[in-house]
Curated annotation (Swiss-Prot):
InterPro entries: Rbsml_uS13_C, Ribosomal_uS13, Ribosomal_uS13-like_H2TH, Ribosomal_uS13_bac-type, Ribosomal_uS13_CS
Superkingdom of the source species: Bacteria
Organism: Borrelia hermsii (strain HS1 / DAH)
UniProt keyword annotations, A-Z: Ribonucleoprotein, Ribosomal protein, RNA-binding, rRNA-binding, tRNA-binding
Segments for region (Disordered): 97-125
Role played: Located at the top of the head of the 30S subunit, it contacts several helices of the 16S rRNA. In the 70S ribosome it contacts the 23S rRNA (bridge B1a) and protein L5 of the 50S subunit (bridge B1b), connecting the 2 subunits; these bridges are implicated in subunit movement. Contacts the tRNAs in the A and P-sites.
GO molecular function: rRNA binding; structural constituent of ribosome; tRNA binding
Record bears the keyword rRNA-binding: yes
Gene: rpsM
Name listed for the protein in its UniProt record: Small ribosomal subunit protein uS13
One annotated Gene Ontology cellular component of this protein: small ribosomal subunit
Coiled-coil boundaries: none
Amino acid sequence: MARIAGIDLPNNKQLQIALTSIYGIGRARALEICEKTGVLPDKRAKELDNDEVNKLRKIIESDYVVEGKLRSELAMSIKRLMDIACYRGLRHRKGLPLRGQRTKTNARTRKGKRKTVANKKMASK
């Protein structure tokens, strides 16, 4: 089982798909990595030899920001927005959509489950 960037690649999948199990690598980037290293993207992960795994590991660690470092960079950029109190930072802090979507209705994913107002039905009668 190949281990790259702290992640065990799934053995039975093609390399181009197996690489997407690493956070920060999608299909396009996986194909790009395969092209740089000269490894066939259709090859199964279990068929890789140590030399090919080392090539992949070297390219990924040197050229790309993946896994924990990428997660921390994203968290730091969001924290920076909140610290400078710009519009996007305030929206992050309040848990509302950032990019101009309506919030009177919809926006349920960002706002979370509905918070019901107690006794609203009884008061209206």
